[in-house]
Amino acid sequence: MRTFTPKPGDINRRWLVIDAEDVVLGRLASQTAILLRGKHKATYAPHVDGGDYVIIVNAAKVALTGSKRDQKVAYRHSGYPGGLKATSYVDLLEQNPEKAVEKAIRGMIPKNSLGRQVLSKLKVYAGAEHPHAAQQPEAYTIHQVAQ
């Protein structure tokens, strides 16, 4: 039996909106990565971008369990010697909560050209409003154990 490869006509992309208020960041990121890659679909193929578009709202109200909000640090490097920058998640969630959510999801997506294509379908907003009403997104809820 040959490997099934979905053709462009076989791929049915939906627009989903996820409310991140009081959702644990890691659980949000893993569920979103699955939706973006299309692993929840029967037509999944690892070499084809068949995932859905995902809009995340209320990124500023995402939850971090334990003492991660105070102790977890996000690193980035400029590429120059001595260019390592460190930002605590307290500061990151205050200044740019979209980046905190995008960084968590980016870590769960492949680091190649297909991963970059998949990440282009992710839209993250700090507040409750988003400019994608014309796409008629469906609500998607993240089910999690009470924290």
Curated annotation (Swiss-Prot):
Record Pfam families: Ribosomal_L13 (PF00572)
Keywords: Ribonucleoprotein, Ribosomal protein
GO cellular component, one term: cytosolic large ribosomal subunit
Superkingdom of source: Bacteria
InterPro entries: Ribosomal_uL13, Ribosomal_uL13_bac-type, Ribosomal_uL13_CS, Ribosomal_uL13_sf
One GO process term, biological-process aspect: negative regulation of translation
Entry keyword annotation includes DNA-binding: no
GO molecular function annotations of the record: mRNA binding; structural constituent of ribosome
Homology family: Belongs to the universal ribosomal protein uL13 family.
Quaternary organization: Part of the 50S ribosomal subunit.
Role summary: This protein is one of the early assembly proteins of the 50S ribosomal subunit, although it is not seen to bind rRNA by itself. It is important during the early stages of 50S assembly.
UniProt name for this protein: Large ribosomal subunit protein uL13
Species of origin: Kineococcus radiotolerans (strain ATCC BAA-149 / DSM 14245 / SRS30216)
